[in-house]
Amino acid sequence: FLAVVVVALLVGVALLVTGVVLLLTGKLRFAIAEGAGRDVALLEAFALYLGLMTAGLVWGASDLPGGRAVGLPLLVLAFALGIGWPFLGRREGTTTTDIRRALGLHRGRGVLIETLAGVAGYIALLPVMALGILITFTLTRISGADASHPIGDELTGPLAVFILLTSFAAVFAPVSEELMFRGAFFGHLRTRVHWVAAAGIIGVIFGAIHPQGWAGVPAIAMVGFNMAVLRQWRGSIIAPIVAHALNNGTIVLMVGLALR
C-alpha cells in the first residue's frame, strides 16, 4: 500500500510541475469565469444549502426526535433547494443557460475528456493534499485531537449499511457538494475576488463544516481548494465531481475493507 501511495505522489508531482510549466508558458489556459456568476442567486442558493445541510447533520447526529430519519431528508432537501434556487431566483436578464454555465452544468469538451481531466487533476494535486494531511497529522500529534470521521465507526456494520455509506460518500456527497461549493459558491465568489482567494476561502469553509473537528480542517480544506482549481481549469463541474468521488470512494473503501 505504501508503495502505491509513493508512486501516486511521484506521478502527482510530475503532473503538477508539468501543469505549472504549461500554465506559465501559456500552453495551458483556465476557463473564463462566466458573467452570470455575479448573480447573487448563486450565493443565496449556497446559503440555503449550507443552512439546511448543517441542520440535517446536527439533527441526524443528535438525540432530537426522529434522528437520522429527519436528518437525511433535510440533506436531500438542502441539495434540492440549493440547486433549484439559482434558476428560480435568477435576476432579470439572466437566462437558464447562463445559470447552468455559471454552475458548471455543461459537458465542457465532452464527458469522457472531462472525466479523464478529473482523474489526472486529482493525481496532479495529490502533493497539495498531502501537505494538508501533514499539517493535520502534526496538529493531532501536538494537541491529541481526534481528526477521524465518525463514519468509520459504522463501516463495520451490516454489508447493506456499508454499501449505502459508500454510495453516499462516493456519489451523493461529491455531486451535491461540488455543485454547491465549487458550482454555486465558487462560481459566484470568483467574480468578486481573485479565483485563488475564492478557492482558499471556500476550501476553509468546506473543511470547517466536516465532522473531523478543527484538526482535520487543513486536510479537508486542501481537498476543497484542489476541487476549485479543477473547476477553474475546466469550467465544467464534471472534473471536480469525478476527483471528489475518487477521493471519497478510495478512502471509504480502504478504511471499510481494513476494518471489516
Q: Where does each model-flagged region fall?
A:
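Hydrophobic alpha-helical transmembrane segments of integral membrane proteins
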Residues: A33-L57, G118-A124, I201-G216, I220
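Juxtamembrane helix-loop-helix connectors linking adjacent transmembrane helices
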Residues: G56-V76, R91-A173, T191
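Residue-level recognition of hydrophobic positions within alpha-helical transmembrane segments
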Residues: G35, V40, G110, A173-P174, ...
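Transmembrane helix-loop-helix hairpins at the membrane interface
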Residues: L9, V13, I123-A130, I142-R260
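Acidic-residue sensor for enzyme active/binding pockets
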Residues: E44, E114, E177-E178
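N-terminal, membrane-interfacial amphipathic/helix-forming hydrophobic leader that caps
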Residues: F1-G104, V252-R260
